[in-house]
């Protein structure tokens, strides 16, 4: 097995395969033990690799992760960006090659400054802290791409009960720590004092997760609300066609009116009204006149234009409330290339993918109030926003109910929409709140405070999902403290590992010289 730890392509290929295993641990495959195996193989491959070899090994892991887990990017570029097959393939490959470097630098840092092969327990703790820091960096750098976090694999796994304590971050930390400890067990067997501590650290997260899986951190704040979530299933290539506008507006109106039984909340998906709000005022006023006497609130996605202090127009991806409710929400976390184009002065006009409809949105302000419907506070997330754990927690902590609307037609029949759904489920579990998820073509679903889907519609079907959700009160530990305790722990562990490694390098002796 020395070929795994030595520099060279055999170990790099194994790292590539290890990265490819991580998406298989998540939706729609949900083979959660593969997440543990993936991280164990990565740690084993980095345990003795010199810095340069570790850098390439980390890059191979990242490429395997994204090549399998984000293959749906090709569909967005080819099918809806009007790029030719070779160009779409080239752009997708280039993006994956670039994203893989997220893992290259941490692997180099690990080998160069943090690793201590003579202290397997401390080494495992430092590896878990570095993994946590890496996931945080991936969700922040250049607005972030917080996809495929290891912790999502545990939504149906034994560690799920930890999510209300520390969010998906705590699950990822526990997985990385467990993987490293399992790899180091043979070495720990020769160190009885360290072995005892390692066994406690190995078993405690899994036992705690199982024990807390059904614990209710929040409580109902009122009676259940009847919900109608409308899935219009409008084809993406027709959505922004002006000739299809009237048909789409009639479609959502008719789907809403088709059932005589009263409901409390009606939710339409992202940009269900595919024209600027100012041009849809009469239509929205008609919805308001219908909903208000029936004590119904209707929430829909719609593009919104506002002017800044200089009088310049700014366009936003928004949600408005009609009927018995109030509020307007402007999306804050924008999708690169889908809602704004980085370096647009250079990229605009090169290919159709850089000129998609509604790809010039502005970012909404950070201090927006929540939406209000039937007297309840609703935390809104438009599409991509629900994948940001800290951002979502900030809104959820002020809310009684969670709402996410999306248009996942960009991803076709790939695994992307199912990954997106899984992340929404994790947000509900972290917050201990019900979530309404309404999409254009699926998956439209109702999610309970334990992250379980109670009702759902099939993808690519025009239908209305009827069900009930309950407003909740109280804060989970994660909503109260967010990721700050874990971030502090990671800083302490990484600082300790760095200081120990520097002291080790500074100390004279043949063992130190050999490690150099």
Swiss-Prot record:
Signal peptide: none annotated. GO terms for molecular function: N-acyltransferase activity. Residues 230-471 form the CN hydrolase domain. InterPro entries: Apolipo_AcylTrfase (IPR004563), C-N_Hydrolase (IPR003010), C-N_Hydrolase_sf (IPR036526), LNT_N (IPR045378). It is found in: Cell inner membrane. Pathway: Protein modification; lipoprotein biosynthesis (N-acyl transfer). The active site is at residues 270, 331, 383. The chain crosses the membrane at residues 24-44, 58-78, 90-110, 125-145, 163-183, 192-212, 479-499. GO terms for cellular component: plasma membrane. The keyword Cell inner membrane applies. Keywords: Acyltransferase, Cell inner membrane, Cell membrane, Membrane, Transferase, Transmembrane, Transmembrane helix. It is an enzyme of class 2 (transferase). GO terms for biological process: lipoprotein biosynthetic process. Catalyzes the phospholipid dependent N-acylation of the N-terminal cysteine of apolipoprotein, the last step in lipoprotein maturation. PANTHER family: APOLIPOPROTEIN N-ACYLTRANSFERASE (PTHR38686:SF1). This is Apolipoprotein N-acyltransferase. The lineage of its organism: Bacteria, Pseudomonadati, Pseudomonadota, Gammaproteobacteria, Pseudomonadales.
């Amino acid at each position: 097995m020395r070929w795994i730890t030595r520099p060279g392509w055999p170990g790099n290929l194994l790292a590539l395969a290890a990265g490819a295993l991580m998406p298989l641990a998540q939706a729609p495959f949900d083979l959660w033990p593969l997440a543990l195996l993936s991280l164990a193989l990565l740690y084993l491959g980095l345990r003795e690799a010199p810095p340069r070899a570790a850098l390439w090994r980390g890059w191979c892991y990242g490429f395997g992760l994204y090549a399998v887990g984000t293959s749906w990017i090709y569909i967005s570029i080819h099918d809806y960006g009007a790029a030719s097959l070779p160009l779409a393939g080239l752009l997708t490959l280039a993006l994956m090659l670039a994203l893989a470097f997220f893992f290259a630098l941490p692997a180099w840092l690990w080998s160069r400054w943090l690793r201590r092969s003579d202290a397997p327990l401390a080494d495992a703790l430092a590896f878990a802290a570095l993994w946590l820091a890496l996931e945080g960096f991936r969700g922040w750098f250049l607005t972030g791409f917080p996809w495929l976090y290891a912790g999502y694999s545990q939504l149906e796994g034994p560690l799920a009960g930890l999510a209300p304590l520390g969010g998906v971050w705590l699950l990822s930390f526990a997985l990385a720590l467990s993987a490293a400890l399992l790899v180091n067990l043979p070495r720990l067997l020769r160190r009885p004092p360290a072995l005892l501590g390692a066994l406690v650290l190995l078993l405690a997260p899994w036992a705690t997760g199982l024990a807390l899986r059904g614990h209710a951190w929040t409580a109902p704040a009122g009676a259940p609300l009847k919900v109608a979530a409308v899935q219009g299933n409008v084809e993406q290539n027709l959505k922004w066609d002006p000739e299809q506008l009237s048909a789409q507006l009639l479609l959502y109106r008719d789907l809403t009116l088709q059932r005589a039984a009263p409901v409390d909340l009606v939710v339409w998906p992202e940009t269900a009204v595919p024209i600027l709000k100012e041009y849809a005022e009469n239509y929205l006023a008609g919805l308001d006149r219908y909903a208000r006497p029936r004590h119904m609130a209707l929430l829909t996605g719609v593009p919104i234009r506002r002017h800044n202090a200089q009088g310049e127009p700014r366009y936003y991806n928004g949600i408005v409330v009609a009927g018995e409710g109030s509020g307007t929400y402007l999306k804050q976390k924008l999708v690169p290339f889908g809602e704004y184009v980085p370096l647009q002065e250079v990229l605009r006009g090169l290919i159709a993918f850089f000129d998609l409809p509604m790809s010039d949105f502005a970012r909404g302000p950070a201090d927006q109030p929540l939406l209000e419907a039937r007297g309840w506070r609703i935390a809104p997330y438009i599409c991509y926003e629900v994948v940001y754990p800290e951002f979502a927690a900030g809104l959820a902590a002020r809310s009684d109910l969670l709402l996410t609307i999306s248009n996942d037609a960009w991803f076709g029949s790939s695994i992307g929409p199912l990954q997106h759904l899984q992340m929404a489920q994790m947000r509900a579990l972290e917050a201990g709140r019900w979530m309404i998820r309404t999409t254009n073509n699926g998956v439209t679903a109702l999610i309970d405070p334990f992250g379980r889907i109670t009702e759902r519609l099939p993808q690519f079907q025009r239908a209305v999902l009827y069900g009930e959700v309950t407003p909740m009160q109280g804060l989970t530990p994660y909503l109260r403290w967010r990721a700050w305790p874990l971030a502090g722990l990671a800083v302490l562990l990484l600082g300790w590992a760095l200081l120990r490694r520097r002291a080790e390098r500074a100390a004279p002796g043949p063992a130190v010289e050999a490690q150099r």
